[in-house]
């Protein structure tokens, strides 16, 4: 469905918009799902958005070849093998922006498989744990690394993830309650001293 592919492109642009990427990168991200599914031809893209955007889309597509390697989605693999795959990925592309678009595409995919069967979620999470989260870390893109790791942990360790999420929620409620009490006490003290001021938590 072209509309779903376009929606994925919009989501990728939204992910990248926080990184202050240039307009060609955002255009390539928006159009990549449509181009990858051959919904829009390369000739049409070249005429409408130019060669630079098409080259970026090519670079992202080339990175898909890495998925054929067992090291991308298995547990029984050494850190050296995984590191080799990451180096291969970086060597495959001439433009750093291709890697950033690919990271956004993987995040969009992780979001999409939230309600998919468990084996599909686990497969996507293993691939990102082995390859893409460390790649984001190596490139210094902490924002994307954090979201990749968050989804991976949620899918690979769901019970532990729910436990931690519950603890964080309880701590937030405790903190809000403490602030509310403190602000109330401060307002009362200021009123008693005749001080007119607004206090917010």
Tell what function each PLM region has.
Residues 1-201:
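Active-site helical microenvironments for divalent-metal-assisted chemistry
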């Amino acid at each position: 469905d072209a509309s779903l592919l376009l929606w994925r492109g919009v989501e990728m642009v939204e992910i990248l918009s926080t990184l202050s990427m240039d307009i060609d990168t955002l255009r390539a991200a928006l159009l990549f799902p449509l181009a990858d599914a051959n919904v829009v031809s390369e000739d049409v893209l070249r005429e409408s958005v130019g060669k630079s955007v098409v080259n970026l889309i090519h670079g992202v597509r080339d990175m898909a070849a890495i998925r054929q390697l067992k090291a991308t989605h298995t547990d029984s693999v050494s850190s050296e093998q995984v590191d080799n795959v990451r180096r291969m990925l970086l060597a495959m592309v001439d433009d750093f922006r291709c890697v950033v678009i690919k990271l956004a595409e993987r995040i969009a995919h992780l979001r999409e498989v939230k309600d998919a069967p468990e084996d599909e979620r686990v497969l996507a999470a293993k691939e990102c744990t082995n390859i893409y989260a460390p790649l984001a870390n190596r490139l210094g893109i902490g924002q994307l690394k954090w979201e990749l790791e968050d989804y991976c942990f949620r899918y690979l360790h769901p019970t532990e993830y729910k436990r931690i999420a519950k603890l964080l929620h309880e701590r937030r409620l405790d903190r809000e309650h403490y602030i509310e009490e403190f602000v109330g006490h401060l307002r009362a003290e200021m009123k008693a001293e005749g001080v007119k001021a607004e206090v917010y938590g």
